[in-house]
């Protein structure tokens, strides 16, 4: 029995011992082969022993390895001035905003002020670098947070002013010699006569250029000069370039008081040899800033073809050439410009000087219209009159083809005249457009009526029938015979009086089968100022825009064996100052076309369909009788004065 028990223990030991050996091998880094090591472990073979060891940055027995979070504790990483970011088996140091990682130095501060594109400071601000960031500081005299800076008026450095810059209009200290508007009006010259200009919209820095002068007058200017009532002049001398911006008083002369009104302005002398002025609107109207015409001279660049450039005491100036001298007034070279709204006559200043006119007093029939100096290709003495009957003593003369405006230019070398009074007559002729063809025809088919405005003057309105779309060939005789394929060209014209304010408007134009303009059978061509849209042959060329109105339509006949067509147009003188005269026909009409004022109706006809004989003598007689109709329009007193 004892031997059997010993044998049992021996067998048990033989079976259990290998099991303990295998189990012990699995609990240590030793392995039977390297494939049993973890992916992040290193396998070492030492004879018969295989050892697994976790790599740096990992922890475990080699068979199992886990990542070590170096960022979890401060002593396991070296990111003292940066941000630690754990990675698999290691870590990285990421610099904070405003810092840059440098090998061996870690994170160091970035200077945003020296590296392009890193700061967003305003262009005028100063960038100040700080640890990990920066700040922006506006310059002295500016307000803002540094990202936006704007100057404060009165705080700019000497010689600069707070002015808007670019499209944004930001206020920036700038040199007004580089930022100004240019005033080129020749009428600002103290030589120019009276007018009604007022500088009520002046605000900012300006430079005077052109023939009127390049700087303000420094002495009291007589009233009714510079195209204004009360001329404004600089009460004080102009500054030198080293003085920078100076303040001066601008005075206005009126009622025998050279400084009845005044305003403060600023002046600066610029390096280019010119002045700029910080002007403000005058205290009253009509006041305007005046220039000294003698200030135009100064550089040889301005010399004309009739002048030489000479040096006088170190200053270059223009001097008249001897070749252009004349010995008789009749040889004076002149320049006459006939513009749409004004007439200008100019005389050679050099030739006037050669005749002894060191000073030139030039005026028209109305002495209020005086001459002025004007420099261009040549040096001229010029004078201007409106192309109208009345102003400056201008007289209108009219014939069948042209309207002619005439005046007389007077020349003197002194204010008073004792010996010779030099007079130069001049005139400009203007063609009368559509009216020419009517007045040159022997017997045009035309209807006319007279319109009086407040009893101050008469306007004549005519209506005529033309053969062509240019309205230059009127039909002649008491009647017209046309086929239904032909086109009628109808023109109405306003003649006489001052046409600068009123335009001709056709309010209703229609056709009837009889000469009676009140015939109940009417075919409207224009109704309530607008054309009949259903008739595509109607073309309104002009209406409510000028002194004439025109339309065309294809010939037609009335139903019911009626071969005669009569045209009738109700016309109206529209005041452009207070009314909308040009029709707008896309929407609501102006008024009902049922009522037509027969005292304002022009009549034409008869127009007979070709191939039909008709007695028209009675109709023509009736039509000619209409020429004596006068239409009275009662307007307000203000309008009457304007027309008068």
UniProtKB/Swiss-Prot annotation:
Keyword Mitochondrion: no
Region of interest (Beta hairpin), ranges: 151-174
Region External hydrophobic patch (EHP): start-end pairs: 601-609
Tissue-level expression: Expression restricted to the thick ascending limb of the loop of Henle (TALH).
Region of interest: Internal hydrophobic patch (IHP): 457-467
Membrane topology classification: Lipid-anchor; GPI-anchor
Lipid-modified residues, GPI-anchor amidated serine kind: 615
Stretches for region Flexible ZP-N/ZP-C linker: 433-456
ZP domain ranges (all copies): 337-592
D10C: region residues: 175-294
Record-linked InterPro entries: EGF-like_Ca-bd_dom (IPR001881), EGF-like_dom (IPR000742), EGF-type_Asp/Asn_hydroxyl_site (IPR000152), EGF_Ca-bd_CS (IPR018097), EGF_dom (IPR024731), Growth_fac_rcpt_cys_sf (IPR009030), NOTCH1_EGF-like (IPR049883), ZP-C (IPR055355)
Subcellular location: Apical cell membrane; Basolateral cell membrane; Cell projection, Cilium membrane
GO-annotated molecular function: calcium ion binding; IgG binding
Gene3D superfamilies linked: Laminin, Zona pellucida, ZP-C domain, Zona pellucida, ZP-N domain
Domain EGF-like span(s) in chain numbering: 30-66, 67-108, 109-150, 295-326
A Gene Ontology BP annotation from the UniProt entry: cellular response to unfolded protein
PANTHER family in the cross-refs: ENDOGLIN/TGF-BETA RECEPTOR TYPE III, UROMODULIN
Swiss-Prot/TrEMBL domain comment: The ZP domain mediates polymerization, leading to the formation of long filaments. The core of the filament consists of interlocked ZP domains which assemble into a helical structure. Each ZP domain consists of an N-terminal (ZP-N) and C-terminal (ZP-C) region connected by a flexible linker; the linker allows the ZP domain to wrap around the ZP-C subdomain of the preceding subunit. The heavily glycosylated N-terminal part of the protein (containing several EGF-like domains) forms branches which protrude from the core and are involved in pathogen capture.
Protein name: Uromodulin
């Amino acid at each position: 029995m004892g031997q059997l028990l010993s044998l049992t223990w021996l067998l048990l030991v033989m079976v259990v011992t290998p099991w303990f050996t295998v189990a012990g091998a699995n609990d240590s880094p030793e392995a039977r082969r390297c494939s049993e090591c973890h992916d992040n472990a290193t396998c070492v073979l030492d004879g018969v022993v295989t050892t697994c060891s976790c790599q740096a940055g990992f922890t475990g027995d080699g068979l199992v390895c886990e990542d070590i979070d170096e960022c979890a504790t401060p002593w396991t990483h070296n990111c003292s001035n940066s941000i630690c970011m754990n990675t698999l088996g290691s870590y990285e140091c990421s610099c904070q905003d405003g810092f840059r990682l440098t090998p061996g130095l870690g994170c160091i501060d970035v200077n945003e002020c020296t590296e392009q594109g890193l700061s967003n400071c305003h262009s005028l601000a100063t960038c100040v670098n700080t640890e990990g960031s920066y700040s922006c500081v506006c310059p002295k005299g500016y307000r803002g947070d540094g990202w936006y800076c704007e100057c404060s008026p009165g705080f700019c450095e000497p010689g600069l002013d707070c002015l808007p810059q670019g499209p944004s209009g930001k206020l920036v200290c700038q040199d007004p010699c580089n930022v100004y508007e240019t005033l080129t009006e020749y009428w600002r010259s103290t030589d120019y006569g009276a007018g009604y200009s007022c500088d009520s919209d002046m605000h900012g820095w300006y430079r005077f250029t052109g023939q009127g002068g390049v700087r303000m007058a420094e002495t009291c200017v007589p009233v009714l000069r510079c195209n204004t009532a009360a001329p404004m002049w600089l009460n004080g001398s102009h500054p030198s370039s080293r003085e920078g911006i100076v303040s001066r008083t601008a005075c206005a002369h009126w009622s025998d008081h050279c400084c009845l009104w005044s305003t403060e302005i600023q002046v600066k002398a610029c390096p280019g040899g010119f002045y700029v002025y910080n002007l403000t609107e005058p205290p009253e109207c009509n006041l305007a800033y005046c220039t000294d015409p003698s200030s135009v001279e100064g550089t040889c660049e301005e010399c004309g073809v009739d002048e030489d450039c000479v040096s006088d005491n170190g200053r270059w100036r223009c001097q008249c050439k001897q070749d252009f001298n004349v010995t008789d007034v009749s040889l004076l070279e002149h320049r006459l410009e006939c513009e749409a709204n004004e007439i200008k006559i100019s005389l050679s200043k050099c030739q006037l000087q050669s005749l002894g006119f060191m000073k030139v007093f030039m005026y028209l029939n109305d002495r209020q219209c005086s001459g002025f100096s004007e420099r261009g290709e040549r040096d001229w003495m010029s004078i201007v009159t409106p192309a109208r009957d009345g102003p400056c003593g201008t007289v209108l003369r009219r014939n069948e083809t042209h309207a002619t405006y005439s005046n007389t230019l007077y020349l003197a070398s002194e204010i008073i005249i004792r010996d010779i009074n030099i007079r130069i007559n001049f005139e400009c002729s203007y063609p009368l457009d559509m009216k020419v063809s009517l007045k040159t025809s022997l017997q045009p088919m035309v209807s006319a009526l007279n319109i009086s405005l407040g009893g101050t003057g008469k306007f004549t309105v005519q209506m005529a029938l033309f053969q062509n779309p240019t309205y230059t060939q009127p039909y002649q005789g008491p009647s017209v015979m046309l086929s239904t394929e032909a086109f009628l060209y109808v023109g109405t014209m306003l003649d006489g009086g001052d046409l600068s304010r009123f335009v001709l408007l056709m309010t209703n134009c229609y056709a009837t089968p009889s000469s009676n303009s009140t015939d109940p059978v009417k075919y409207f061509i224009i109704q309530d100022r607008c054309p009949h849209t259903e008739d595509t042959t109607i073309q309104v060329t002009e209406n409510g825009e000028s002194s004439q109105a025109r339309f065309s339509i294809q010939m037609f006949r009335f139903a019911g064996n009626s071969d005669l067509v009569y045209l009738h147009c109700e016309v109206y003188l529209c005041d452009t100052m207070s009314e909308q005269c040009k029709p707008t026909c896309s929407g609501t009409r102006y008024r009902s076309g049922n009522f037509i004022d027969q005292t304002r109706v022009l009549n034409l006809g008869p127009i007979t369909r070709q191939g039909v004989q008709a007695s028209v003598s009675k109709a023509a007689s009736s039509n000619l009788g209409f020429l004596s109709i006068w239409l009275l329009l009662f307007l307000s007193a203000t309008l009457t004065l304007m027309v008068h």
